[in-house]
Amino acid sequence: MELLIQPNNRIIPFSAGANLLEVLRENGVAISYSCLSGRCGTCRCRVIDGSVIDSGAENGQSNLTDKQYVLACQSVLTGNCAIEVPEADEIVTHPARIIKGTVVAVESPTHDIRRLRVRLSKPFEFSPGQYATLQFSPEHARPYSMAGLPDDQEMEFHIRKVPGGRVTEYVFEHVREGTSIKLSGPLGTAYLRQKHTGPMLCVGGGTGLAPVLSIVRGALKSGMTNPILLYFGVRSQQDLYDAERLHKLAADHPQLTVHTVIATGPINEGQRAGLITDVIEKDILSLAGWRAYLCGAPAMVEALCTVTKHLGISPEHIYADAFYPGGI
């Protein structure tokens, strides 16, 4: 049996029942992967022809709604088929690790957000925009996005308290300076594409600011000269945080433009009012040739996906990280 791989037009023989990711790795085919368990979605690829048995949906991959897409680590090859490895020039491979860490600072930028600064016992490699699972106790673990970069002295995480949320309430009540945690990852596909040279749209809603900060800082630090348009949206003034940090970043880097958007209530000078989707539609005539990084609550991310597609961005160039509340 044979597997045809695009876009490099390579043919690889395999035996029925073989795992797709193992076949690719054994034959030196570059593909992004991380957790090897179907959780992170990093090894997603498209089936062009033939059939592949994919158990990813059973592992909670609800975002893989298009039946053409499968997770290579969860896929079994049953017959001749052809696949496409997406963005073959933007492959990232950060083998998943479990690392111990210590909380060195707990900050309260708003009434319902805690900013944790964590010092890890070992280096932790990830791509800007990815996330990791933080385990605070055997019964309290949840994924959170890194707000910084791999070479930062401390990892930064933004955690919003969800009423009735088992993990977030534990964090607010029990996590203090000196608390020991475990970090596992990295996970996620909404990471910075460093070879893209066109404009970037980065949108963060609430604590979705964390991965957006990582992406923007990563682009600036790596020397990317792309124009970057950053929108940070919150519900009201009391939910706004890090605005000065964002505007200082923009002042230091002319290629970066920052807009803070307040959905309800009064606004201050320089702020925008209304829904973030409406503001973006007013500001941008076309997103053709752009890359979009969208992070925040599922409803906001889904609305942004619709708007950005309507403005002309290719769907494969939308990188979305929706903060689903499961297991909170």
Curated annotation (Swiss-Prot):
Gene Ontology molecular-function annotations: 2 iron, 2 sulfur cluster binding; FAD binding; ferredoxin-NAD+ reductase activity; ferredoxin-NADP+ reductase activity; metal ion binding
Mutagenesis or variant effect for residue 121 to A: In strain: G7
Binding annotation for [2Fe-2S] cluster: 35, 40, 43, 73
- Please give the annotated consequence of changing residue 11 to L: In strain: G7
Effect upon mutating residue 8 to K: In strain: BS202
Instruction: Report which reactions are catalysed by this protein.
Output: 2 reduced [2Fe-2S]-[ferredoxin] + NAD(+) + H(+) = 2 oxidized [2Fe-2S]-[ferredoxin] + NADH; 2 reduced [2Fe-2S]-[ferredoxin] + NADP(+) + H(+) = 2 oxidized [2Fe-2S]-[ferredoxin] + NADPH
| Outcome of swapping residue 276 to V | In strain: G7
Q: What is its EC number?
A: 1.18.1.7
Q: Which keywords annotate this record?
A: 2Fe-2S, Aromatic hydrocarbons catabolism, FAD, Flavoprotein, Iron, Iron-sulfur, Metal-binding, NAD, NADP, Oxidoreductase, Plasmid
State the free-text cofactor note: Binds 1 [2Fe-2S] cluster. Binds 1 mole of FAD per mole of enzyme. Also able to use FMN, but the activity is less than that obtained with FAD.
Q: Where is the FAD-binding FR-type domain?
A: 96-193
The keyword Oxidoreductase appears for this protein:
yes
Question: Mutating residue 36 to M: effect?
Answer: In strain: G7
List GO BP terms, alphabetically.
catabolic process
How is the protein's activity regulated, according to its record?
Strongly inhibited by p-chloromercuribenzoate. Also inhibited by N-ethylmaleimide and o-phenanthroline.
Mutagenesis / variant outcome for changing residue 85 to I: In strain: G7
Among CDD domains, the record links this protein to:
fer2, O2ase_reductase_like
> Which Gene3D superfamilies is this protein grouped with?
3.10.20.30, Nucleotide-binding domain of ferredoxin-NADP reductase (FNR) module, Translation factors
Which PANTHER family does the entry mention? NADH OXIDOREDUCTASE HCR, PROTEIN RFBI
The record's similarity note reads:
Belongs to the bacterial ring-hydroxylating dioxygenase ferredoxin reductase component family.
Protein role: Component of the naphthalene dioxygenase (NDO) multicomponent enzyme system which catalyzes the incorporation of both atoms of molecular oxygen into naphthalene to form cis-(1R,2S)-dihydroxy-1,2-dihydronaphthalene. Ferredoxin reductase catalyzes the transfer of electrons from NADH to ferredoxin (NdoA). NADPH is also effective but yields only 39% of the activity obtained with NADH. Also able to catalyze the cis-dihydroxylation of biphenyl and phenanthrene.
**Any idea what this protein is called?**
Naphthalene 1,2-dioxygenase system ferredoxin--NAD(P)(+), reductase component
Question: Which organism's genome codes for this protein?
Answer: Pseudomonas putida (Arthrobacter siderocapsulatus)
Q: What is the lineage of its organism?
A: Bacteria, Pseudomonadati, Pseudomonadota, Gammaproteobacteria, Pseudomonadales
**Coding gene?**
ndoR
